[in-house]
Amino acid sequence: MSGLPRSVPDVLDPLGPGAPVLVAGGRVTGQAVAAVLTRFGATPTVCDDDPVMLRPHAERGLPTVSSSDAVQQITGYALVVASPGFSPATPLLAAAAAAGVPIWGDVELAWRLDAAGCYGPPRSWLVVTGTNGKTTTTSMLHAMLIAGGRRAVLCGNIGSAVLDVLDEPAELLAVELSSFQLHWAPSLRPEAGAVLNIAEDHLDWHATMAEYTAAKARVLTGGVAVAGLDDSRAAALLDGSPAQVRVGFRLGEPAARELGVRDAHLVDRAFSDDLTLLPVASIPVPGPVGVLDALAAAALARSVGVPAGAIADAVTSFRVGRHRAEVVAVADGITYVDDSKATNPHAARASVLAYPRVVWIAGGLLKGASLHAEVAAMASRLVGAVLIGRDRAAVAEALSRHAPDVPVVQVVAGEDTGMPATVEVPVACVLDVAKDDKAGETVGAAVMTAAVAAARRMAQPGDTVLLAPAGASFDQFTGYADRGEAFATAVRAVIR
């Protein structure tokens, strides 16, 4: 279709033909939003404070505006569609809220257009969120749907944006959504949605933990609500869900209306009386995390009728994504694992607990999260720690309090002096890569080279050198993938 219906359904209000819409953010998401709004007959104006981002929009004939000017003109817009990076505290969005102008995200726009039939019969949305495990679970879910012969597309925070896939002939969408996307998707009501777990994260974006949790809870407002019962916050969200069908999953034996583990097999007692799905040993993701991801994906797949055989086939052939518990090398009895995607303390704890003896490479940007509970839980697995990144002092302090016998090395990068010179641990060492850097290396590469070399000196045969940073990467790297590649490069250098 190339235009909005003549009689605009309530689900699209206030979006209608000719409606003036402010698109907040001119990058990739903003480009997709502006294109869709233009296609369906609205009148978008693109807002960004970077002239480079506005230029392509202006060349297409769209009006553009700076954020300060948009604030002054905010009452002239019927709607604001914001990119996920815009928090509610952003002056532009705060002004829109104060003026009573509705604010949607790109996911909200996609949901409403799909629900209104603008792309044909609406798809069934199967949505996954949680602090950790979203990408693996959503990818597993998609594989299960395909193995079951269903026409499904992987999208959202993984693969393609939802707006970009609505023209595809799919009946089901396997959608990964972040808390940012969910915050700006207030009307989302998926066919089925899962909350894997809830832990402190992104508190630099959300004003409070309660707001972060409330955003995640939006996936549980549809027909089927699924949540991890081993996580107290996720379990509480399931208890409060308005969904007609509520399903839990756990590592232990399942009760009625649950999926779980019995006799080393995944079992469904929610969508069947007692159906064995697959052996735990066939799950390629290591540790309890892999079992939980498979249970969540299976619950969503079973909610739309995917048979057990297809679920087992999909899991058995599943391949873990890059930088997610990825074994980089095994040398001299030491295993080197890249879990750079463990970008918060909750994820790092799960990663460490998957191995019996770990030399832990950690640090980065903690985004306001505390590590004390996580370090206390993993202390017995740690045989050493190498700390990197801007917030490594917080990691050092948690180790000092909860794992005082664990040797620690801290890697300093040049002018970065935000860390105390020593910490209260039996073996403390500070390495300054600026004093011994290699020509042509970036700061991140130099830091990782020193970190892996230090970890190798600590490790013994049978140990795992594990990159599970517990923080974001943007202080020293371009992203978690860049950090993981730097780790792999450093590992190859140290084992040759």
From Swiss-Prot:
One of its GO terms (cellular component) is cytoplasm. Pathway: Cell wall biogenesis; peptidoglycan biosynthesis. ATP binds at residues 130-136. Phosphorylated by PknA. The keyword Cell inner membrane does not apply. One of its GO terms (biological process) is peptidoglycan biosynthetic process. GO terms for molecular function: ATP binding; UDP-N-acetylmuramoylalanine-D-glutamate ligase activity. It comes from the Bacteria. SUPFAM superfamilies: MurCD N-terminal domain, MurD-like peptide ligases, catalytic domain, MurD-like peptide ligases, peptide-binding domain. Its main location: cytoplasm. Its EC number is 6.3.2.9. Keywords: ATP-binding, Cell cycle, Cell division, Cell shape, Cell wall biogenesis/degradation, Cytoplasm, Ligase, Nucleotide-binding, Peptidoglycan synthesis, Phosphoprotein. It catalyses: UDP-N-acetyl-alpha-D-muramoyl-L-alanine + D-glutamate + ATP = UDP-N-acetyl-alpha-D-muramoyl-L-alanyl-D-glutamate + ADP + phosphate + H(+). InterPro entries: Mur-like_cat_sf, Mur_ligase_C, Mur_ligase_C_dom_sf, Mur_ligase_cen, MurD. It is found in: Cytoplasm. Cell wall formation. Catalyzes the addition of glutamate to the nucleotide precursor UDP-N-acetylmuramoyl-L-alanine (UMA). Belongs to the MurCDEF family. HAMAP family: MurD. This is UDP-N-acetylmuramoylalanine--D-glutamate ligase. It comes from Mycobacterium tuberculosis (strain ATCC 25177 / H37Ra).
